[in-house]
């Protein structure tokens, strides 16, 4: 057992006792790692536990004030890897913030690298869910800032997708600058950040999500630049050198790359996709972020009409499509709140498993 916190529907925190079964390491990075396993109490559920090391900017903060926890506490949606509980622990004189999150077994990057191909219906289904997640973020004035295949988790059998990893997310109302044009991974970085703009808007996520959606439809990266300049060259080669109005709208200096005529997205991708997919891409991949279609407007596009058909279309694996009616709702309630959690008498085996889990999480 360990002491942690849950989240009420109004975003407030409450104390709760947490117990986990065995976990295994599922992913690691410079500042965090993720374990996957079973939560035993207060609910039985497969979860992901993200361990984040505090840095110089966050080490003085209480766990509940940690930026990612603050942002996730404002969100709850079926297409988001929701924060269920959180706690902290000390290891090697460092505070580690631990986020207990919704879990899905795969991510798009691994599936792509394994050569998995999605049929058009499933690609539309996953794209729809991704833009539902962005629409929910926009309604809460939040920008993810790092949408990429590694942060898109999935259950292929069930046809479900969740947007994960909000470590770079920001609130729009703070008028905060990005601080660096490197906030978004290069292949998915929109032109305004490549050009050096430090202001961020919800349109950043629109560009990134469209690049991810292309991978669902085409099974390859859309803009695979070798470096920042090459990324700019690729994008301007498709859409043309930014106009005077584009530069003024973005508020940056002119990029120092050769001026070429626009090839167009169809030619660049060898006209491999259906026209309605290109209509979607041309509406969301605009040099000027103010001209990109919003997530809520994207969801109304003809691209997704097949998902609204009645009766629902059958997926190729025979499994019914998820009920998408709730995905477009802006407000979702968390699980029934339990503020007082009874102590659970554990067996010797469970105690040993818990001790083993704690040792693993401290590695």
Curated annotation (Swiss-Prot):
Biological classification of the source: Eukaryota, Metazoa, Ecdysozoa, Nematoda, Chromadorea
InterPro entries membership: GSK-3, Kinase-like_dom_sf, Prot_kinase_dom, Ser/Thr_kinase_AS
One example of a Gene Ontology biological process annotation: positive regulation of proteasomal ubiquitin-dependent protein catabolic process
Region spans: Disordered: 311-363
Signal peptide: none
Annotated positions binding ATP: 26-34, 50
Domain of life assignment: Eukaryota
Gene3D superfamilies recorded: Phosphorylase Kinase, domain 1, Transferase(Phosphotransferase) domain 1
Protein's organism: Caenorhabditis elegans
Presence of keyword Zinc: no
Subcellular location: Cytoplasm; Cell projection, Pseudopodium
Single GO term (MF): protein serine/threonine kinase activity
Catalytic residues, chain numbering: 146 (proton acceptor)
Gene: gskl-1
Tissue: Expressed during multiple stages of spermatogenesis, in males and hermaphrodites (at protein level).
Domain Protein kinase: 20-304
Name of the molecule in the record: Putative serine/threonine-protein kinase gskl-1
Role noted for this protein: May be an autophosphorylating tyrosine kinase, a bifunctional (serine/tyrosine-specific) protein kinase, or a serine kinase that is a substrate for an associated tyrosine kinase. Acting in concert with putative serine/threonine-protein kinase gskl-2, required for sister chromatid segregation and spermatid budding during male meiosis. Plays a role in regulating female meiosis II, together with gskl-2. Involved in sperm pseudopod formation and function, together with gskl-2.
Enzyme Commission number: 2.7.11.1
